Swiss-Prot record:
Lineage, opening ranks: Eukaryota, Fungi, Dikarya, Ascomycota, Pezizomycotina
Residues annotated as the enzyme's active site: 429
Subcellular location: Secreted
Family of the protein in this entry: Belongs to the peptidase M36 family.
Name of the protein this chain belongs to: Extracellular metalloproteinase MEP
Principal location listed in the UniProt entry: secreted
Inducers of expression: Expression is controlled by the prtT transcription factor.
Record: residues binding Zn(2+): 428, 432
Length: 635
C-alpha cells in the first residue's frame, strides 16, 4: 500500500454555479406548490450486523449449499407464519457475499414496504435486515369481493392531489401480475402510467392501495392512492433523488479567499461520471454523506474503523449546516466539515472521470456498473481525523480496495482550522490516489516509491490543486502559493509559489540536485507543470468552469483543461517509478496520442524553460543534467 503523507493545498477558480436549472418543456412537481416530502414513507427496518447474528451451529440449514435456501430458512425462523415471496434479484457479489431479497405478501398481494434482505457467505447468514409487518392481516382477500376502485380512478386521484402534469382519459390494460395494469391514453408522462394493487404499512396497519407509477422527468413517482378513496394518497416514493449541499463551491479554495461564500447546490453531480448520483451506489440509496464514490465521516479517535462513525444525515438529503470562521472547537461544525469534504471529493471524482480516470483505469467506486476495473473501493473520507495534526494523507492500495483520506486539524491559529474546508488540501490528497493508480497500472500501487518519482507524486498533487484554482482574470503572471489558509501563511507551505517568473520562482531541473525529500522535489515538478499549463492556455485560451468542454475528437478545447488531460494521460503511459525526464516524455507522447502532436512546440518550450530540454539527463547517484534546448524543428 502506498501512503502519501503530505498535504497540498490549492484554491479553485471562481465560477458561478447554477444548480438544477429549469429547462423549458420539462415536467415535474413544483416543490413550492406540492411538498412531496410530506408524503415520504417512514423507514421501519432493523438491521442485524454480522456480530449480532445468532449462533447458527444448531440450525440445520447452514449446511445447505444453496444460498437462497439458507436465506429462506432464516426468514422462516425469524418471521414464522408470515407469508412472503422471494424477489428474483439475488446474486453473489464480488466479495463472496450472496444477497437475497424477500417481499411480504398478504392474500397473494404484496405489502410494498415490508421487506427482508439476507446476506449469506460460505453457507451461513452473514447479516440481514427486516421490515416485515407483524400487525393484523385482513382476514379476507380483497380479490374475493373486489371491493376496490378502478386503477384509472387512482390515477385521477394521484394527478389531482399531487398536481401531476398528466391529462387525457386513461384506459386500463391488464399486464402480467396480480391486479397490474398499464394506463393507456394519457399525455404528459414520459411513458404510460402503470398501476398495481398493493398493501402499504401505514400507521401500524395495512392500507389497500393502488401503486400508481408516473414518470414525469424531474420526478418519477410511485404514488400509493387509497383503493377506496382517490383523494387519499398514503405515501409517495420518488425515484429521482434530489440532494442539496450548502458548501463553498468548486472554484473557491478556502473561506478567506476573495469573494468566498457558501452556496446551496442541488444535485451537483455529473450524470455521465456519476450515473447513480453521489448518494447511491446503484443498489442502496443513502441520506447521508455516502455514495458510490465516497463515504465521509468524522474520525476523532484516528482509528481505522469508519462505517459506524458519525456522519451528517438528513432524510430529505439537505446537507445545510451553520458555520462561521469563529466557531470552535472544530467538532462543533463537524456536519459542515464532512459535507464540504464529501462535496469536493465527489466533484473531483467527476472531473477526473471526464479526463480519463474511469473504472477501467482504476478509479474509486463501489459499483463500476460493468465498465471494467474492480469495484468496492470508494474513497473513505475521514474528516477531523484524530491521528495527527497540521497535515493530511491518502492511502492508495491496488484497485478493488478503498482509498483512505485523513484530513487533520491545523493548530497554527485560534480558532484551529479544519483542512477539509480547504479545497486544495482535498484535491492534493485525492490526486495521490490518481497518480498511484495510473502509474504502473491499477494493480500496482508501488510505482511512485523512488525519491524522484515520489517527489513527482507530490508535484502532480500540487499541480491539480493549483489548476483548479485558476480564475477568469488570471494570466501567466499570476502566482499561487500552496496551503496558505490552513498554515495561516500567505506564502504557503512550499519554498516557492507556483509562478512562471524565474525571479519569483527560480527553480529548474538542476534544483533537484540539492534536494533530498519528496515535497521540495514536488515543488520543482509542479513548477514545471505550471509552465506547461500557461503555455497551453496561451495557445488555446482559458476555461474557468467545473468541467471541460471537448471537441469532436475528445480533446479539451481550453489550455488549462488540456494540460490536466495530458498530465493525466502521461501518468498512464510512463513507467513504474519514473523520473522527470521520463515523465516529460510521457506527457509529450500523450499529446501525440491525443492531438497528433499539435502542441509539441508549446510543451517543449515550457519544459526547456525549467531545464527539461532535449539534453536533460537523469542521474540517480550523481548530478542530473538540465538542458534549456528545444529540439530542432519542433517550433
Amino acid at each position: 500500500m502506498r501512503y502519501s503523507l503530505s498535504l497540498a493545498l490549492l484554491g479553485v477558480a471562481a465560477v458561478t454555479v447554477v444548480a438544477h436549472p429549469h429547462t423549458p418543456g420539462r415536467h415535474g412537481v413544483e416543490r413550492r406548490a406540492i411538498d412531496l416530502d410530506a408524503f415520504r414513507l417512514q423507514p421501519t427496518a432493523e438491521y442485524v450486523p454480522k456480530e449480532e447474528v445468532p449462533d447458527q451451529s444448531s440450525l440445520a440449514f447452514i449446511s445447505n449449499d444453496n444460498y437462497v435456501d439458507v436465506a429462506t430458512d432464516l426468514v422462516k425462523s425469524v418471521a414464522p407464519g408470515i407469508e412472503f415471496r422471494v424477489v428474483g434479484d439475488h446474486y453473489v457479489g464480488t466479495n463472496g457475499v450472496a444477497h437475497v431479497n424477500f417481499k411480504q405478501t398478504a392474500h397473494g398481494i404484496d405489502i410494498d414496504n415490508a421487506d427482508f434482505n439476507v446476506n449469506v457467505r460460505d453457507g451461513k447468514v452473514f447479516s440481514y435486515g427486516n421490515s416485515f409487518f407483524t400487525g393484523k392481516i385482513p382476514e379476507e382477500s380483497p380479490l374475493k369481493k373486489r371491493d376496490f376502485s378502478d386503477p384509472t380512478v387512482a390515477l385521477t386521484g394521484a394527478t389531482t392531489v399531487l398536481q401531476l402534469p398528466i391529462s387525457g382519459e386513461a384506459k386500463a390494460e391488464a399486464k402480467e401480475g396480480t391486479e397490474t395494469y398499464t394506463l393507456k391514453g394519457t399525455s404528459g408522462a414520459v411513458s404510460d402510467p402503470e398501476a398495481r394493487l398493493v398493501y402499504l404499512v401505514r400507521d401500524d396497519s395495512l392500507a389497500l392501495t393502488w401503486r400508481v407509477e408516473t414518470d414525469i422527468e424531474d420526478n418519477w413517482l410511485l404514488s400509493y392512492v387509497d383503493a377506496n378513496n382517490k383523494e387519499q394518497v398514503h405515501g409517495v416514493v420518488d425515484y429521482v433523488s434530489h440532494a442539496s449541499f450548502q458548501v463553498y463551491p468548486w472554484g473557491t479554495n478556502d473561506p478567506l479567499e476573495a469573494g468566498a461564500a457558501r452556496v446551496t447546490l442541488t444535485d451537483p453531480w455529473d450524470k455521465a461520471s456519476s450515473p447513480f448520483g453521489w448518494l447511491s451506489d446503484g443498489t442502496s440509496t443513502y441520506t447521508t454523506t455516502r455514495g458510490n464514490n465516497a463515504i465521509a465521516q468524522s474520525n476523532p479517535s484516528g482509528g481505522t474503523a469508519y462505517l459506524n462513525n458519525y456522519r451528517p444525515t438528513n432524510a430529505n438529503s439537505i446537507f445545510s449546516y451553520p458555520w462561521t470562521p469563529a466557531m470552535s472547537p472544530p467538532s462543533s461544525f463537524v456536519d459542515f466539515s464532512a459535507t464540504q469534504l464529501f462535496y469536493t471529493a465527489n466533484v473531483f471524482h467527476d472531473l477526473l472521470y471526464k479526463l480519463g480516470f474511469t473504472e477501467a483505469a482504476g478509479n474509486f467506486q463501489v459499483n463500476n456498473n460493468g465498465k471494467g476495473g474492480l469495484g468496492n473501493d470508494q474513497v473513505i473520507l475521514n474528516t477531523q481525523d484524530g491521528s495527527g495534526t497540521n497535515n493530511a494523507n491518502f492511502a492508495t492500495p491496488p484497485d478493488g480496495q478503498n482509498g483512505r483520506m485523513r484530513m487533520y486539524i491545523w493548530t497554527y491559529t485560534t480558532p484551529q482550522r479544519d483542512s477539509s474546508l480547504e479545497a486544495g488540501v482535498v484535491i492534493h490528497e485525492y490526486t495521490h490516489g490518481l497518480s498511484n493508480r495510473l502509474t504502473g497500472g491499477p494493480s500496482n500501487s508501488g510505482c511512485l516509491s523512488a525519491l524522484e518519482a515520489g517527489g513527482m507524486g507530490e508535484g502532480w498533487s500540487d499541480f491539480f490543486a493549483t489548476a483548479a484554482r485558476i480564475k477568469q482574470n488570471d494570466t501567466a503572471d499570476t502566482d499561487y502559493p500552496m496551503g496558505e489558509w490552513v498554515a495561516a501563511n500567505p506564502k504557503g507551505i512550499r519554498a516557492y509559489p507556483y509562478s512562471t517568473s524565474l525571479t519569483r520562482n527560480p527553480q529548474t531541473y538542476a534544483t533537484t540536485n540539492t534536494l533530498s525529500t519528496v515535497h521540495p522535489i514536488g515543488n520543482v515538478w509542479a513548477t514545471v507543470l505550471y509552465e506547461v499549463l500557461w503555455a497551453l492556455v496561451g495557445k488555446h485560451g482559458l476555461q474557468v468552469s467545473t468541467f471541460p468542454t471537448f471537441d469532436a475528437s475528445g480533446v479539451p478545447t481550453s489550455g488549462n483543461f488540456l494540460a490536466q488531460k495530458l498530465v493525466l494521460d502521461g501518468m498512464a503511459l510512463q513507467p513504474c517509478n519514473p523520473n522527470f525526464v521520463q515523465a516529460r516524455d510521457a506527457i509529450i507522447d500523450a499529446d501525440q496520442a491525443l492531438t497528433g502532436g499539435a502542441n509539441k512546440c508549446e510543451l517543449w518550450t515550457a519544459f526547456a524553460k525549467r531545464g527539461l530540454g532535449s539534453g536533460a539527463k537523469y542521474a540517480a547517484s550523481k548530478r542530473s543534467v538540465e538542458s534549456k534546448t528545444i529540439p530542432a524543428g519542433v517550433c
